[in-house]
């Protein structure tokens, strides 16, 4: 069955259905490209399949989508002499290979409930520099994607982003493995790596010409080219560069229209001079609304839970309308994120700290912005679900006069309400909990208040 592929197509998806299966009718499918070459053959095994330059449904080979006449290959190995079958094929053209442009038939929803979901936004497999022990522990090898995902499931993560350095080759593995791993969302991603800094692009599949990153203007233009469809966060912004960590220091500057987030903790560097917390807070004070995130930057899934940069620690709790790629990316961009630095392996249902603000009949979640008249009362509600006594700290700009003793103890499961008057300028508040040794265990993103 011929069909005409226009120019500018980044992905082809074919959805088929046919009648007569109760009478043992079988229809097989395959695909032939514009050059009359076989792209793949799935027989009667798959009724929906997709391909792009970077990934394809198993049975099909990834390839660039050239314009011209393609053919849906149809075989009928069995149909009874007196039977008829109605065949319908829907063909979808996407402008790019990225998930944001995929048709709904490809959308994976692991959980349809609106709730907090926990995951790791920075990890590597053998598609870049991730390694692990071989099957018989004879040597270290590029780590297979499935092994990283298995460890993420073992750690009870709801989602995992594999962010490989300047390559998207893992996309084909994720396309194959996502149906099997039906209780964890696999996010496509890239660690865009240059001598001017590293940045994660969550939701990116298409190639980015990292050679353009050899100049700073090229680096920024590459970030801007993808920023509308993905979540871009600066990685380890104050990490030293040079031989210590090539290109790790952020030199991209701010304001930067391509960036929506800052990785304020990479591995276990929260509380060290390499943490990006102060870097992020200074940007808040300058008026930049950027989501704080964290990432393990794991390069070996075999690491013990208490090792540096072990998979799933630190983690990000994301309040999303469902557990799908589009919903997680949307919530990351909106700042609905709590960062968890604790070493509590049992925490799988809710973040250690939650915060909402009530302004009249309006309720603001973490990451939300609200217009508030001068002098209006804001009720700030903070709840901890931790199993141990903790200390609460609140942070805001100088205009927000919060009558609260920072470091006050919180009992397990305690909820407190703090009343605040809207000051004469726009403000924000974020919260953190620490242990008795003042180690940061969790922190929220801000709620923003704009003077009405």
Predicted segments, located by residue:
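Non-catalytic, beta-strand-enriched accessory regions in extracellular/secretory proteins
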Residues: 1-22, 26-29
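Extracellular and analogous surface-interaction loops
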Residues: 2-10, 60-67, 370-374, 423
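Noncatalytic modules at the cell exterior or secretory-pathway interfaces
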Residues: 10-13, 61-84, 425-430
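Surface-exposed beta-strand/loop patches in noncatalytic accessory domains
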Residues: 18-57, 400-402
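Short acidic/polar inter-strand loop motif in beta-rich domains
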Residues: 20-22, 36, 58, 76-83, ...
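Edge beta-strands of jelly-roll/beta-sandwich modules across compartments, strongly enriched
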Residues: 23-27, 80-93
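Beta-sandwich interaction modules
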Residues: 45-67, 77, 417-421
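Extended, charged catalytic domains and RNA/DNA-binding interfaces, predominantly
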Residues: 70-73, 85-452
């Amino acid at each position: 069955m011929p069909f005409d592929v226009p120019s500018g197509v980044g992905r082809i998806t074919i959805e088929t259905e046919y009648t007569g299966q109760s009478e043992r009718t079988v229809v097989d499918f395959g695909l032939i490209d514009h050059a009359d070459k076989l792209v793949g053959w799935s027989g009667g095994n798959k009724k929906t399949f997709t391909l792009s330059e970077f990934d394809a449904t198993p049975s099909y080979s990834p390839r660039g989508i050239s314009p011209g006449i393609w053919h849906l290959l149809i075989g009928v190995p069995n149909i009874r002499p007196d039977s008829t079958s109605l065949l319908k094929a829907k063909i979808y053209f996407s402008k790019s290979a990225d998930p944001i442009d995929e048709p709904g038939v490809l959308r994976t929803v692991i959980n349809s409930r609106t709730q907090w979901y926990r995951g790791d936004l920075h990890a590597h497999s053998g598609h870049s520099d991730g390694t692990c022990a071989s099957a018989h522990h004879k040597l270290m090898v590029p780590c297979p994607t499935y092994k990283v995902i298995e460890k993420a499931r073992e750690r009870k993560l709801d989602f995992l982003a594999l962010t490989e350095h300047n390559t998207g080759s893992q996309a084909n593995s994720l396309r194959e493995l996502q149906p099997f791993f039906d209780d964890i969302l696999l996010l496509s991603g890239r660690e865009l790596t240059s001598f001017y800094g590293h940045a994660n692009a969550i939701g990116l599949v298409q190639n980015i010409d990292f050679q353009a990153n050899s100049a700073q203007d090229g680096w920024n233009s590459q970030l801007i080219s993808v920023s509308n469809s993905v979540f871009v966060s600066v990685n380890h912004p104050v990490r030293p560069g040079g031989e210590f960590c090539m290109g790790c220091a952020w030199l991209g500057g701010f304001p930067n229209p391509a960036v929506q987030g800052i990785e304020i903790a990479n591995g276990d560097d929260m509380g060290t001079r390499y943490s990006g917390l102060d870097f992020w807070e200074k940007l808040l004070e300058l008026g930049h609304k950027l989501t704080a995130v964290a990432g393990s930057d794991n390069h070996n899934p075999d690491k013990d839970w208490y090792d540096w940069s072990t998979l799933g620690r630190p983690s990000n709790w994301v309040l999303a309308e469902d557990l799908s790629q589009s919903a997680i990316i949307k919530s990351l961009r909106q700042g609905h994120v709590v960062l968890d630095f604790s070493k509590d392996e049992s925490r799988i249902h809710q973040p250690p700290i939650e915060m909402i603000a009530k302004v009249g009949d309006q309720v603001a979640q973490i990451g939300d912005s609200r217009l508030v008249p001068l002098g209006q009362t804001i009720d700030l509600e903070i709840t901890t679900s931790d199993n141990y006594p903790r200390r609460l700290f609140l942070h805001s700009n100088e205009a927000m006069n919060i009558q609260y003793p920072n470091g006050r103890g919180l009992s397990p499961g305690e909820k407190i309400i703090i009343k605040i008057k809207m000051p004469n300028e726009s403000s924000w508040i974020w919260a953190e909990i620490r242990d008795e040794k003042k180690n940061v265990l969790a922190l929220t993103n801000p709620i923003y208040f704009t003077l009405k």
